[in-house]
Amino acid sequence: MFLGWRDVLHAKGRFAIITVVVMLMTLLVGFLTGLTGGLAGANVDTVRSWKADRIVMSAPNGSQDASMSTSSIAPDAQQHWEDQVGRSNVTAVGVTQIAAAHDDVTTGVALVAHGPGADLGAGTGPNQADDAVAPSATNVALSEDAADELGVEAGATITIAGHEFTVADVTGTGHYSHVPVIGMSWSAWQELSERTGGTGHPNALLVHAEISDDEAASINAAANTVSPAGFEQLLAVGSFRSEVGSLGMMIGMLMAISALVVGAFFTVWTLQRTRDIAVMRALGSPVSALLRDAIGQSLLVLAVGVGAGIGIIMLVGPAISASVPFVSNWLTTLAPGLLMTLLGLIGAAFALRSVTKADPMQALN
């Protein structure tokens, strides 16, 4: 990479500019990816904490997508699933988004209740204490963010839909559709659901049993339900589907722009060096050596720019995560960085045609 390194030393300003541009693009992609991860966590971390093999919801009408907020599992559908996979493997779950109040403070929350079956603890999502107090008819459990927003501690009284509940425990960090979670007993949730215009039927069934897609399709057809598994479970939260789709498209566009910018720079730079490359060809340099030189040059720029961007994200990410939903880990930093490096090399590869087509006779003109 002798020639490439000499080019970098000779044109420090140009290479510094493109390196800074790559770093800024890495920062944009990295921060957007971290924000996407943080928003996803604030959207569906409670759903993920259920660790269900499948989440059963009522079948949507027409071309609509299945949504937990509009799903209502009829008793006969629940009974059919229990008969097919075992009653102990099916847990009814109810979710209601509503306002909770304490003194003059009111905030939006998601009430989560579950029937017998899987042990979901206090119902407040991940990071619950092992000795968390389970909700009862008059007691609720608050996630940490719900308690902070309402300004309450264990033993305080909050009001939900005109009824007072005692805070039995503050535990867990769960969110549902960007609002903090409050765990409620199954009987209290059913009563509240009916009082606020609902049916009292569960929004979903958690299936903790491995069944094939064919078996699930057969049960769904008989019960008029849908039962997504894996990542598709998270799409049952409507805001997650639109949010991740929008942010994912932005990340993809930024990565494509990065490849275009790097490719354009090296294309122009290679065209400006056409005569130098022709001289090297005339002196006997093989094309393979010139190609390695050009690829090494672009890899150097990408490695420095992407590495600097990742370093800044790793330093700044933990600091901003306290005020905005931001996740800083290998999936939101290293993975986008490696992908940007790969796309940048692909973009730079389009400039290699000028290297392979350089005419040694130009050096004699």
Regions found by a protein language model. Give the residues of each.
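Basic-flanked hydrophobic alpha-helices used for secretion and membrane insertion
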Residues: 97-238
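Short cytoplasmic-facing helical segments at TM-TM junctions of multi-pass membrane proteins
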Residues: 265-292, 362-364
